[in-house]
């Protein structure tokens, strides 16, 4: 389970970007060649974000998900539009950080390489950055490679940086997901912070699991639109008439 959480965390960190609206299309291929497509629309304003996601896959059909992150309130709301309900998860702040575990957990081997290669995406000059990560523990091994094309030449880049810094300030949530102590998480985050710029295209390859029981996954994600625009504060509120689901 820790390997899976670590993968989610790493992908999440690499996509933490801010005060703009952007749309992204992701395609994935996993076990037995099964493919899927996910469309995302993300709004971010200061310390608030809304993510709308629609996923299509052969096994599960169409799935939708809406999440609101309110760093000012320290919560994440998951919105169920079909039933007009929402759930709430608290985000731990640095002052609420859990005690460090007795067992020291080793940091994964993370490498970041700026290649110097460039290409144009959305008429912006982007640089190729490759991130690799290797994890080996009781649950088995995991290898992770992520190729990103990043640029600073996008609308609202300063706001993007500010949001990322604010989000990483809630690192205790991610740290507990990893099962890592505070020092370990800080070292991990320091390595990730070497990646500058906003990724307009990402390719990810991952192999995870014990020997003889491993599976592989590949995804390709591309930003199709990005812009700065006035965003109404109501976008980041629970819709009127929705009830809390315990």
Regions found by a protein language model. Name each.
Residues 17-246:
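Extended soluble regions of mature proteins
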Residues 3-13:
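Sec-dependent N-terminal signal peptides
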């Amino acid at each position: 389970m820790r390997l899976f959480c670590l993968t989610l965390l790493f992908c999440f960190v690499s996509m933490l970007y801010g005060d703009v609206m952007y749309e992204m299309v992701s395609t994935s291929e996993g076990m037995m060649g099964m493919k899927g497509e996910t469309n995302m629309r993300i709004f971010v304003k200061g310390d608030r974000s809304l993510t709308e996601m629609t996923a299509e896959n052969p096994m599960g059909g169409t799935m939708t998900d809406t999440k609101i992150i309110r760093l000012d309130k320290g919560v994440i709301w998951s919105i169920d539009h079909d039933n007009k309900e929402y759930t709430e998860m608290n985000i731990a702040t640095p002052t609420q950080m859990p005690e460090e575990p007795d067992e020291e957990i080793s940091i994964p081997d993370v490498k970041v390489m700026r290649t110097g290669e460039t290409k144009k995406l959305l008429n912006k000059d982007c640089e190729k950055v490759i991130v690799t990560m290797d994890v080996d523990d009781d649950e088995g091994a995991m290898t992770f490679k992520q190729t990103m094309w990043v640029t600073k030449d996008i609308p609202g880049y300063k706001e993007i940086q500010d949001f990322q810094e604010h989000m990483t300030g809630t690192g205790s949530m991610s740290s507990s997901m990893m099962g890592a102590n505070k020092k370990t998480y800080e070292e991990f985050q320091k390595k990730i912070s070497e990646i500058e710029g906003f990724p307009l295209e990402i390719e990810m390859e991952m192999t995870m699991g014990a020997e003889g029981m491993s599976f592989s996954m590949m995804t390709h994600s591309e930003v199709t639109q990005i812009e700065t625009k006035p965003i109404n504060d109501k976008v980041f509120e629970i819709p009127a008439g929705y009830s809390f689901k315990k």
